[in-house]
C-alpha cells in the first residue's frame, strides 16, 4: 500500500528534473552568444583601451572578425555540462521549497519569492565551479582553435589555485547573490503575475501570455541582480595585474568598481544580459511548463 505514493513521489521528482534540464539545455544553446558578449563587457575596465568594445554592435563585429563565428560559443561546454543539472536543480528545488513553505502560514506572493531565493542559493553552489571555467574561457580573446580545452583549463585552475575559494570555487559569494536574487524575483514575479492574469482558452494566445510574463520576469530580475553578476565576472575573470588579486569578495568588489569606475560600471553588460535572460527566461519557463505537462500526460 505504501509503495504507490513512493513511486509517485519519485516519478514527480523525475518529471521536474527532466523538464528543468530540458529547459536549461534549450536556453543555453539559443542564448550563449549574448552571454559571451555580456562577460566581455563586464571584464573590460577602460574605455580608452584599444581592445575595448564601444557598443553592442561593435562587440559582435569585433568578435566575429577577430575570432570567427565560433568565438560566440567560447566557454559553451561548461554551461552545457552544467545546464541540465543546474536547471534541474533550479526548478526541482523551487518546487520542493514551495511545498515546504506550504506548512508555514505565508502569503502566496511571499512563498514564491522565498522558494525562488532558496532555489537560487542551491543552484549557485552546484554551478559555481562551471562558472569559473566558463568566465575564464570567455575572457580569452584568442581564436577558438587557440584557446585551451574546457577540461585542460579546469585542470590549470585546480593545479595553480586548488578547489577552494581562490580556485575552482572563487566568486562563490557573488554567485550566491546573483542566483539567489535572480530566482527570487524571477519566480516571485512570474507566478504571482501569472495567477493575476486570466488563462486564455486559445492555446496560441495562452502561449504568448506566458511568454510575455516570462520575458518581464527575466528582464526585471536581470536589472536587479546585475551588480552581483559584474562582481562575479571581476572575481572569476582575469585580474588587472597578473599575479595580484584585486577582486576577492562580492561586496568589496562592488565597492571598488563603484569607487574607481562609477555607478554605471555596476551595470556593465546589462543590454546583452537583458537580451539573453529576458527571452531566455521566458524560453526556460515555457519549455519547463510544456515539457512537464507532456510528461504528466505521457509518463
From Swiss-Prot:
Report each Solcar repeat as a residue range: 11-100, 107-196, 205-294
Q: Which UniProt keywords apply?
A: Antiport, Disease variant, Lipid transport, Membrane, Mitochondrion, Mitochondrion inner membrane, Primary mitochondrial disease, Repeat, Transmembrane, Transmembrane helix, Transport
Query: What residue ranges are annotated as transmembrane?
Result: 17-37, 70-89, 113-133, 167-187, 205-225, 277-297
Care to name a GO molecular-function term for this sequence?
antiporter activity
Q: How does it sit in the membrane?
A: Multi-pass membrane protein
Coiled-coil regions listed = none
Q: Which GO terms describe its cellular component?
A: mitochondrial inner membrane; mitochondrion
Q: Which GO terms describe its biological process?
A: lipid transport; lysine catabolic process; mitochondrial alpha-ketoglutarate transmembrane transport
Can you tell which superkingdom this protein's organism belongs to?
Eukaryota
Query: Could you tell me what this protein does?
Result: Transports dicarboxylates across the inner membranes of mitochondria by a counter-exchange mechanism. Can transport 2-oxoadipate (2-oxohexanedioate), 2-oxoglutarate, adipate (hexanedioate), glutarate, and to a lesser extent, pimelate (heptanedioate), 2-oxopimelate (2-oxoheptanedioate), 2-aminoadipate (2-aminohexanedioate), oxaloacetate, and citrate.
Protein name (database record): Mitochondrial 2-oxodicarboxylate carrier
Name its species: Homo sapiens (Human)
Question: Which gene name does the record give?
Answer: SLC25A21
Amino acid at each position: 500500500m505504501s509503495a504507490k505514493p513512493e513511486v509517485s513521489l519519485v516519478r514527480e521528482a523525475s518529471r521536474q528534473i527532466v523538464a528543468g534540464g530540458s529547459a536549461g539545455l534549450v536556453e543555453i544553446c539559443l542564448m550563449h552568444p549574448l552571454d559571451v558578449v555580456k562577460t566581455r563587457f563586464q571584464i573590460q575596465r577602460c574605455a580608452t583601451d584599444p581592445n575595448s568594445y564601444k557598443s553592442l554592435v561593435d562587440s559582435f563585429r569585433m568578435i566575429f572578425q577577430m575570432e570567427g563565428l565560433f568565438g560566440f560559443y567560447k566557454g559553451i561546454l561548461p554551461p552545457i555540462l552544467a545546464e541540465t543539472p543546474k536547471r534541474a536543480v533550479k526548478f526541482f528545488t523551487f518546487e520542493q521549497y514551495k511545498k515546504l513553505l506550504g506548512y508555514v502560514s505565508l502569503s502566496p506572493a511571499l512563498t514564491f519569492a522565498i522558494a525562488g531565493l532558496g532555489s537560487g542559493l542551491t543552484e549557485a553552489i552546484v554551478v559555481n565551479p562551471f562558472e569559473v571555467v566558463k568566465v575564464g574561457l570567455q575572457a580569452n580573446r584568442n581564436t577558438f582553435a587557440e584557446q585551451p580545452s574546457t577540461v585542460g583549463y579546469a585542470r590549470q585552475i585546480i593545479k595553480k589555485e586548488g578547489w577552494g575559494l581562490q580556485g575552482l570555487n572563487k566568486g562563490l559569494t557573488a554567485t550566491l547573490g546573483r542566483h539567489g536574487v535572480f530566482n527570487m524575483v524571477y519566480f516571485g514575479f512570474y507566478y504571482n503575475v501569472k495567477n493575476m492574469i486570466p488563462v486564455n482558452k486559445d492555446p496560441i494566445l495562452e502561449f504568448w501570455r506566458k511568454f510575455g510574463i516570462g520575458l518581464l520576469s527575466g528582464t526585471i530580475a536581470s536589472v536587479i541582480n546585475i551588480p552581483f553578476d559584474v562582481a562575479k565576472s571581476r572575481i572569476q575573470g582575469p585580474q588587472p595585474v597578473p599575479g595580484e588579486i584585486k577582486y576577492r569578495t562580492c561586496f568589496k568588489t562592488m565597492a571598488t568598481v563603484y569607487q574607481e569606475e562609477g555607478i554605471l560600471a555596476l551595470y556593465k553588460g546589462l543590454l546583452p544580459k537583458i537580451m539573453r535572460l529576458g527571452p531566455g527566461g521566458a524560453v526556460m519557463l515555457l519549455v519547463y511548463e510544456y515539457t512537464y505537462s507532456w510528461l504528466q500526460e505521457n509518463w
